[in-house]
C-alpha cells in the first residue's frame, strides 16, 4: 500500500462517522488532490555542466483558503510523498481552524552534495517554475526537510522579481529581517506542549513529573524538551538523534543537551546517562513517547512492545495504520500529527497575516495567540473522539473533515 493510499484510508475511516451529513461526491473530491505538478529544473553547476533536477508541488484542497505547505529538498522526494503530505496539510490547517488549505512540494536532491551557489540557483529555479502557480492568495509554500529561512529568502526574492513587486506573504518561514514571524522557530514544539498539557488537564492531571522519551533531537524535539521541562516541570528521561540516544530514569539535563547540539555534537556524548538505540527508546516505559523525527517508526513489528501511556506525534506520520490498530487495542492513546504538530503552520499563518497587513507582533503575543488556537483544537478532538467512541486520530480527522466538507458544500 502506498503512503497516499494509507492517507486515503484514514480519511475514509473518519468519514464513516459523518457520512449521514455529507455526500460521497464530496468525499471523493477530498480523496484526490486538486492538482499535482511535476517540474524539471536545469541548474548550471560550478564545474560548468548543467544538471536537471525533478521537482513536485501538490495542491490538495483550497476550500477553506490558499494551499499551504512546505517544500523539502531530499533524495527520497516522490510524487506519492508530496500528495500524501499535502492531504495531511489540508487536515492540519482545518483541525486548528485557520483559513488555509493544504499543499506540499519538493525537489529530488541531496542538498549536502551541492555548493551554496548551486543550492541558491536550484532554489531560484524552483521559485521561477512555481511562480505561475503560487501567490499570497493562491498557494503559500514554507520550509520543510532540508530547507531553511535562507532558501525561503532566495525564493521570495526570485518570485518578487518575476512578478515585479515585493511580495513577502507568498512564502513563510523567512528570516525576521525580511518579514519572518517572531516565535516561528519554536512554534511546532510549543504547540505540542499546549496539546499534551491540554490532554492531561482534560483528565484532571498535570505534566509535572511526567516522564518523557523523545525520538529526535532536531529543532522540534530539542525545543520541545526544553519547553516541557522548564515550563511544565516534566522529566525528559531519554532523547536521541541520528547517531543514537541516551537514557537516565532520573532525568536528563536538557540545557546541557541543547549546548551539545549547538556545538554540532551528538546527544550520545552526554556523560550522565546510558546509551540507547533509537529503536529501544521507543519501547521505554514512560508516561509520554514523542516521535519527533522520522515517518513510520512505530509499525506492526514494534507496536505491541510500546509501553508509553500516551504518544504525541510531533513528526509527520510516525505511526503506521497497522500500528495504530495495535495501539488502540492496547488502550494507548495517540495525539495525532495533524493536531500535535500544527503549531508550526499556525504561526506560519500568523506570518502571512503580518506580511499582508504590514503589522508585526512581538513573540509574547504570537505565543498567546498560538495557545488560544491549540488548546481549543485539542479539546475539540478529545470531545469528538469521546462523542463517537473512537480514537483521538479519528476525533481530529472528524473535526477537520467536517470543516472542509462544509466549506465545499456551501461553495457548491
Q: At which residue positions do the language-model features occur?
A:
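Glycine/serine-rich phosphate-binding loop and adjoining beta1-alpha1 elements at the start
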Residues: 93-208
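Glycine-rich, N-terminal phosphate-binding loop and its surrounding beta-alpha-beta segment
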Residues: 38-111
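Conserved active-site and cofactor/substrate-binding residues in soluble primary-metabolism enzymes
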Residues: 2, 6-9, 21, 77-80, ...
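Adenosine-phosphate binding glycine-rich loop
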Residues: 2, 199, 308-412
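Glycine-rich phosphate/diphosphate-binding loop of Rossmann-like nucleotide-binding domains
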Residues: 174-175, 180-286
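Short, Gly/Pro- and small/polar-rich lid/capping loops
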Residues: 2-40
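Rossmann-like adenosine-cofactor binding region
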Residues: 244-334
Amino acid at each position: 500500500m502506498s503512503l497516499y493510499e494509507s492517507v486515503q484510508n484514514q480519511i475514509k475511516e473518519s468519514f464513516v462517522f459523518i457520512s449521514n451529513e455529507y455526500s460521497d461526491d464530496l468525499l471523493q473530491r477530498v480523496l484526490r488532490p486538486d492538482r499535482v505538478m511535476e517540474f524539471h529544473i536545469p541548474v548550471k553547476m560550478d564545474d560548468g555542466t548543467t544538471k536537471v533536477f525533478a521537482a513536485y508541488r501538490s495542491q490538495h484542497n483550497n476550500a477553506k483558503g490558499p494551499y499551504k505547505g512546505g517544500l523539502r529538498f531530499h533524495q527520497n522526494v516522490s510524487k506519492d510523498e508530496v500528495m500524501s503530505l499535502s492531504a495531511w496539510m489540508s487536515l492540519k490547517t482545518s483541525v486548528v481552524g485557520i483559513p488555509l488549505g493544504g499543499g506540499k512540494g519538493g525537489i529530488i536532491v541531496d542538498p549536502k552534495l551541492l555548493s551554496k551557489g548551486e543550492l541558491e540557483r536550484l532554489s531560484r529555479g524552483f521559485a521561477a517554475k512555481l511562480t505561475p502557480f503560487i501567490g499570497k492568495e493562491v498557494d503559500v509554500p514554507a520550509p520543510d526537510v532540508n530547507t531553511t529561512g535562507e532558501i525561503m529568502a532566495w525564493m521570495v526574492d526570485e518570485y518578487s522579481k518575476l512578478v515585479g513587486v515585493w511580495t513577502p506573504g507568498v512564502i513563510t518561514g523567512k528570516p525576521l529581517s525580511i518579514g519572518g514571524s517572531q516565535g516561528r522557530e519554536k512554534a511546532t514544539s510549543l504547540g505540542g506542549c499546549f496539546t499534551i498539557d491540554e490532554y492531561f488537564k482534560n483528565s484532571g492531571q498535570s505534566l509535572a513529573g511526567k516522564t518523557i522519551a523523545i525520538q529526535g533531537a532536531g529543532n522540534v524535539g530539542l525545543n520541545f524538551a526544553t519547553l516541557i521541562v522548564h515550563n511544565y516541570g516534566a522529566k525528559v528521561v531519554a532523547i536521541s538523534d541520528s547517531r543514537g540516544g541516551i537514557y537516565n530514569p532520573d532525568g536528563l539535563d536538557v540545557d546541557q543537551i541543547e549546548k551539545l547540539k549547538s556545538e554540532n555534537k551528538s546527544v550520545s556524548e552526554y556523560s550522565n546517562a546510558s546509551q540507547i538505540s533509537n529503536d529501544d527508546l521507543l519501547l521505554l516505559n514512560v508516561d509520554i513517547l514523542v516521535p519527533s523525527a522520522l515517518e513510520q517508526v512505530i509499525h506492526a513489528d514494534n507496536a505491541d512492545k510500546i509501553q508509553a501511556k500516551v504518544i504525541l506525534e510531533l513528526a509527520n506520520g510516525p505511526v503506521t495504520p497497522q500500528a495504530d490498530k495495535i495501539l488502540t487495542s492496547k488502550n494507548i492513546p495517540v495525539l495525532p500529527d495533524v493536531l500535535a504538530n500544527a503549531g508550526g503552520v499556525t504561526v506560519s499563518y500568523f506570518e502571512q497575516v503580518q506580511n499582508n497587513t504590514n503589522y508585526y507582533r512581538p513573540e509574547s503575543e504570537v505565543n498567546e495567540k498560538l495557545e488560544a488556537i491549540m488548546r481549543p483544537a485539542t479539546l475539540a478532538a478529545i470531545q469528538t473522539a469521546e462523542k463517537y467512541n473512537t480514537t483521538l486520530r479519528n476525533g481530529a480527522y472528524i473535526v477537520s473533515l467536517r470543516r472542509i466538507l462544509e466549506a465545499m458544500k456551501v461553495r457548491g
